[in-house]
Amino acid sequence: IIGHDGRLSSLEIKNKLIDTFRRHGVDVVDISLIPTPVSYYATKKLDIPNLIMITGSHNPKEYNGLKIIIDNKPFFGEKIKSLNDLDDASLSTTLGQLTFKDVITPYTDEIISQFNNLDKLKIVWDLGNGAIAPIIHKIINSIKGTNIILNRSIDGNFPNHHPDPTIKKNITQISNYIKEKKFDLGIAFDGDGDRIGILDNKGELIYSDIIFLLLSLDLLKEKKDLVAIADVKCSKILFDTLKNNGVDIHMSKTGHSLIKEMISSKNADIAGEMSGHIFYNYKYYGYDDAIYASLKLINILNNTKKTLNELTSVYMKSSSTPEIKLYCDEKIKFSLLDKIVEDIPKHYDSGVDLITIDGVRLETENFWFLLRASNTQNCIVFRLEHFVKDKFKLEKKIGRDPKIATVIHESEVSKKACCRLSFLS
């Protein structure tokens, strides 16, 4: 199966892949321009275990890439490197067949059939000029209510804003609309529809780990022995709350492919990432689907008298940064992280927990911070959460903490990669 998103280079890449596969005897099913979650659905619906989805996801518009499924398992990392060892002599010269399949219609029908009477809310949807447009049009025609769509046309230039809904500057338009029109909810998607950004009734972006917490607690009502997974960037409030409610919660490395492997090994019911990937395995297929997750959230709000702001405020007991990306040369970012992991204990005495499953996450009684190398961009990701009752400027707090400042400024990252936090300069 081959599908593609709406980026400017995606169609050309798809056509070249199809031509190459067919020339070597591989039959291809073309599912055309489609969101990534629907391409995953195609492997289930068509009972074909192999998929290439051409997408740059939330990355800058000049980026592109391949999301690969082989034998119903994510194909990444060392598996990709192993392709160099294949013997070309074993390839067929018989021309493979090409067929075209519509999976948008069965996907949409199946999704809609699981939800009823989602008509109480006023919702604004920001499609970000991404590949998700055909799906959302069909869904809102079925769920009724008041629905407004922003940036509905598919355009790989992303003329209105960059397609990453977890970054505040990218959700200014939808935020203003919520405030001006008094809407209940804002839902924004990335370029290929597998990551979600949620805004509450006040137009405020709610971090995806808190949204995942709400969704997990809702699922707990139905599945009492819930097993959940959250990535290393997520709030400690999420982990503590789920654990205190009897959930078997596991911390994972960041990355949708890595989380899918862990879902399988732990037989998890639900999983989520700070970046907005949310995976439902209980009564669903186990892949990250922002469309399905958005309908689950709408269902929660549709069955309560509370606003989203009221539902989430009880968990907003900390001050935290978003993901802060520190530029780092691609060739050295992982080795530099190894050096940081080695150096950090020198700056802290007892009373700290070091979690090194993905970079380093240092936890104390009052705060935690994370430094990890991005899997998809030439940067190192930093996030900090501090538990205080009074709000303050987190940037200044970090700057006043000599230990954190030393870790950042005196590390090999700062010396060799010109990484810095703007508020520490």
Segment roles from a protein language model:
Residues 418-419:
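Cysteine-centered motifs
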Residues 223-383, 388-404, 408-412:
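Phosphate-binding and adjacent anionic-ligand microenvironments
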Residues 1-63, 139-199:
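N-terminal small/polar loop signature for handling phosphorylated ligands or for N-terminal nucleophile
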Residues 64-179:
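Gly/Ser/Thr-enriched, mixed-charge loops and adjacent short helices
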Residues 49-63, 178-200, 205, 249-289:
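Glycine-rich phosphate-binding loop
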Residues 76, 151, 204-223, 287-299:
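Gly/Ser/Thr-rich active-site loops/lids in small-molecule metabolic enzymes
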Residues 22, 82-109, 113, 201-274, ...:
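Proline/glycine-rich low-complexity loops and linkers
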